[in-house]
Amino acid sequence: METRNSSGLDQFCSLLVERPGLTLLDLAGANQSTMAFLTNLGHRVYSDDFLLQMDRCFGDGDFYENQADPEKVAQFLDAALDYPAQHFDGALVWDTLEFLSGPLLETVVQRLGNMLRPGSYMLALFHAEERAATIPTYSYRIQDRKTITLAPRGRRHPAQFFNNRSLEKLFQDFQSVKFFLTRDHLREVIVRR
């Protein structure tokens, strides 16, 4: 496991401290350190392993081809993102969006936007290595408000790579997109609904 400083997480957490009692979504799967950190701030946390849900729904055969199958997409959305509108005050999306192909990616971003209350924030990470055939995947764990622990989960082929312009387009229906410069292979983004 490795740790990294995260300016994006620090900004996300500064928004949480201002308003206790929020309802948050964590797509990295349940882990003790993140749960303890967020609940100690007085928040409720819903957790789901988004990558595991993707593997269950699309992993039999060609992972990205299966994301175009309407039945599998419906099964995935019901399993991973079946929450009411405006249910969450924030979401930790991590790097999960990189593994969704075009139409499904747009559907998931719309669904996330619908699940978030107006004015809420979402933290997402994107790999900056545009020429890499595979990228490392991690289970992200919050150690403190400025530090993330990355537990390796192997490597995957991303559906696509994102530069700042493509991220602005992806989140065009949101109020704002803020980018954080990092010294490693991850681009941090905070999106405001």
Give the label of every model feature segment.
Residues M1-L16, G21-L24, N31-D82, Y121-R193:
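Class I (Rossmann-like) S-adenosyl-L-methionine-dependent methyltransferase catalytic domain
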Residues F88-E106:
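A short SAM/SAH-binding and catalytic strip from SAM-dependent methyltransferases
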